[in-house]
């Protein structure tokens, strides 16, 4: 299978490309920089979609970059990096003489409203209560194709755990020093997924023709709280993890609106993901963290 991957040079993209190549697929990246087996976004816009059997978009500016202030300029960057790349791929797919058979977009569980009681599956409502839920709604709308000639899949990802990037890379130093702990109250749900399972779900969605619609890209461990995650990460490192990070500090670093992503959470279940027949490699948090910090 020839697969076109937008944003394929990041943490998730690198893992996906490795898995697809290991399974015998050909991969072309769409990125800002030219290179072997790559096209640029400018080339995609001017020349259209290269011949491919499937397309995946992973592109998007890191929202939780602590070095960037949460102001209008950065919010626009966060929006544009997702909407413009998604819209460009969707447009070139719809205009292609021979469109790909499959189109996969990775968004986020921020679509669902944070709650200490509600449980969300792929059919649950959401998408209209704050900046991030509205972002996911616009993002998924930008990727929607007319008609049904191309099979469409949306994977709403949780926090991605794995070696060499993602959430773990930002947390390791304080936890290794024994200074880690829950964020805020620690009671908020923490929807997570191991990198191997997220890219596994993407590969499964590419290869299994019966898969379509929205899938929740989270582990089947929906009751994990932030405090439980912190305790498990400390245990994986052999370090204590009981020093909480106060809400006020999180809000000071990330801004009040962006801090919601860390101080609040959702109980998300992968009901449809499991129903597709996908089998998780890391369904348990302890095993996922042991691998991620190895």
Question: What is each PLM-predicted segment?
Answer:
Residues 3-23:
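N-terminal Rossmann NAD(P)H-binding glycine-rich loop of SDR-like oxidoreductase domains
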Residues 2, 208-256, 290-294:
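Mid/C-terminal beta-alpha module of Rossmann-like enzyme folds, strongest
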Residues 128-152:
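Active-site Tyr-X1-5-Lys
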């Amino acid at each position: 299978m020839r697969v076109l991957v937008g944003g394929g040079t990041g943490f998730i993209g690198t893992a996906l490309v490795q898995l697809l190549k290991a399974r015998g697929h050909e991969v072309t990246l769409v990125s800002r920089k030219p290179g072997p087996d790559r096209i640029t976004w400018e080339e995609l816009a001017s020349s259209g979609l290269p011949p491919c059997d499937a397309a995946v978009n992973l592109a998007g500016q890191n929202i939780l970059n602590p070095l960037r202030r949460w102001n209008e300029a950065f919010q626009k960057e966060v929006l544009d990096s997702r909407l413009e790349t998604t819209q460009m791929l969707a447009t070139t797919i719809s205009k292609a003489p021979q469109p790909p058979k499959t189109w996969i977009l990775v968004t986020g569980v921020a679509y669902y409203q944070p709650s200490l009681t509600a449980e969300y599956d792929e059919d649950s409502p959401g998408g209209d209560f704050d900046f991030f839920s509205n972002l996911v709604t616009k993002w998924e709308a930008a990727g929607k194709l007319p008609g049904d000639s191309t099979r469409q899949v949306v994977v709403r990802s949780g926090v991605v755990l794995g070696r060499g990037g993602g959430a773990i890379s930002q947390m390791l130093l304080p936890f290794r020093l024994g200074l880690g702990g829950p964020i805020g109250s620690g009671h908020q749900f923490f929807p997570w997924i191991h990198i191997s399972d997220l890219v596994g779900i993407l590969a499964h969605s590419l290869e299994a023709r019966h898969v379509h619609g929205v899938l929740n890209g989270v582990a089947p461990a929906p009751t994990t709280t932030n405090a439980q995650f912190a305790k498990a990460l400390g245990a994986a490192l052999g370090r204590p993890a009981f020093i909480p990070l106060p809400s006020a500090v999180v809000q000071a670093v990330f801004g009040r609106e962006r801090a919601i992503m860390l101080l609040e959470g959702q109980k998300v279940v992968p009901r449809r993901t499991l129903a597709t027949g996908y089998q998780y490699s890391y369904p348990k948090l302890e095993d996922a963290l042991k691998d991620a910090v190895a």
